[in-house]
Amino acid sequence: MANLVLDLELSGIEPGWHEIIQLGAALYDKEWNLKSTYISNVYPENRESFSLSSQKIHQLSLEELEDAPILHEVLEDFEEWLTKYLKHKSLRSLNICGQSVMYDIVFLKAAYRQEKKEWPFSNMLIDLHNIAFYLFEVLAKNGIKTPRSLSLNAIADFFDLKREGLEHNALEDALITGECLRECMNYTNILKLKA
């Protein structure tokens, strides 16, 4: 089963009021080999909801989003991109992955509802936050120093993964999350249960 790693940049934290302003995704096969990437800015139709505190995180201004496609166009383009790389398999054949991925899914589902589109994805989730929590507990109990935080940066630092650029965007976070998930899954080849 293929793995779709998502990350969204948002105009704020309240689904239904705040909006998706950038969608980034990385598509991996079941062995966590990167197959393709996707990124698009999204024009914020509710300009009142654009939060300055969120802008400090994603560093996208309203002016930069002025020429971005609207949400409906981005969702259509996103699904077309996925279908192309899935060789026309159903989008329900994907694991949806991310760092605290439920937060992104809540916003993405709200976007699908707003656009009166049916949710095309499965309910199969892989959450880096949860996997890292469990893995780090096991490693700590075996004497390996683990991060004190479960932030994406802390998990990435543990695996010696670094951001490529200085800018924070949804695609870079999706790629770093995917690489962290690959590293977590690599431990399944190392960790053994005692009989």
Where are these regions (language model features)?
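Short, structured loop/turn "capping" segments at alpha-beta junctions
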Residues: 89-90, 119, 190-191
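Acidic, Mg2+-coordinating catalytic module of metal-dependent nucleases/exonucleases
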Residues: 95-102, 106-112, 141-195
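Short, glycine/acidic-enriched loop or turn micro-motifs at the edges of active sites
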Residues: 10-12, 130, 176
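General structural signal for alpha-helix termini and helix-helix connectors
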Residues: 84, 114-117, 137, 141, ...
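Short alpha-helix plus adjacent loop in nuclease-associated cores
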Residues: 126-145
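Conserved non-catalytic scaffold segment of RNase H-like nuclease domains
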Residues: 1-111, 157-168
